[in-house]
């Protein structure tokens, strides 16, 4: 797995995966280690604490949504799929995104992961765009 890092433009990892891949206990040091290997955007998911994203010259932290969790199966995939969809829809490479755009995309991804966790199963729990937007409008952010 480590040998593939230089081939990735965008990586999404959990805090535990980051330490395993980089050997760094510090979240920031681990993310910067990925960037030093050629990753353009490193996103670390932190469960109830939301996520942190790192790109050259940029670090953003976004809280997640305060939903009633039933099953987290598929939440990470939902998060990453939503993030990738937004980046692709923007027509920009990760390094071309403004901090505001990236922040909005991360918020959308957090809403996708949070919404997924309100249902059981993996594929059946994947939220629609409408469900994600409803979460963003109606569910308060979780500040841990």
How should each PLM-predicted stretch be described?
Residues 1-32, 49-50:
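Conserved beta-alpha-beta core of the PfkB/ribokinase-like small-molecule kinase fold
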Residues 23-144:
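Conserved phosphate-binding/catalytic region of the ribokinase-like
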